[in-house]
Amino acid sequence: MQYGFARSSEKSFKLDPSVTDPEFHGFWTWPCTMFNVPPGSNFMTVIYEFPVDAETTLQHYDIYFTNEELTQDQKDLIEWYRNVFRPEDLNLVESVQRGLKSRGYRGQGRIMTDKQRSGISEHGIAYFQHLVAQYHQ
């Protein structure tokens, strides 16, 4: 599980002001599926990532809303995921993936972890990358 704290943004995710605990949760299942649940939202995302080779990852996003008819805010959020978040996220995934083949890789790569396993730490991502590296050895 990965978690962090969400902040409202006019450009992306708008956090409901009534939410008192803005904690974001991400759950992943080996080898390539992640479920993300933003705080106080009426949607979740499911992300599938398929490493093709050392430089390429195929990525597929699904966004599930609780309502059938999308609001304008929801349509705007979908566009933000498509045009901003996904390209940034995919670039990060592929840069870590390339780092796994470098001679300087020492089990952590370009991922931030801390001993306290705090909410800003990326232990889940580091563990996932470790599993990918083991699988491809």
Please report, for each region that a protein language model flagged, where it lies by residue.
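C-terminal catalytic domain of Rieske-type non-heme iron oxygenases
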Residues: 1-137
